[in-house]
């Protein structure tokens, strides 16, 4: 650990201490899905299905938002999403069906520190636990580290939301700790678990994602041959 002229330990100097960029992208193209900047005109009809018409009410338990009660409420929400630059919202289009089956966002965007959080994840049942869902996360990670030049990618969740925590760990996020009494929402107290990926970890994670997503990693029934952790 380097020392300053007072003989105090300090963090390592950075070769590049510049600010990162704000997200500004229309399309990230993958093999199984595309990640598209969310717009009402392009995505409202498909999103309405899993946000309202056939929404799973339990999906909203750990979200700050409540379930939608009308089509108009969904439209208003998506109009707000489209205009927002922090969070910056995306739709996930499944290539097999051609339908938008999920949304997520880059949030808590801090260009000065080159730090950003993945959040607001809502996936239709047809997208959950699929290659397309994993590829969508990979595409956005790649964009964050390689195009935006960020150093830190965060994932936070209610400490009781085990599916979210398990997803973070599977995707390669490292558990950092728990913020107790971190938030109040829906009349409840929330302890928040924090996870992250940092830029030095990205090259190995990228290799792991690409090995897992390769067509030869799946059999004729679409079952994986090696888990993401083992790739």
Residue ranges and their predicted role:
Residues 1-130, 143, 188-193, 197-231:
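GNAT-family acyltransferases
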Residues 133:
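Glycine-rich acyl-CoA binding loop
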Residues 146-156:
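Conserved GNAT acetyl-CoA-binding A-motif
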Residues 155-164:
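Conserved beta-strand-loop-alpha-helix junction that forms the acyl-donor binding cleft
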Residues 174-188:
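Conserved catalytic-core motifs of GNAT/GCN5-like acyltransferases
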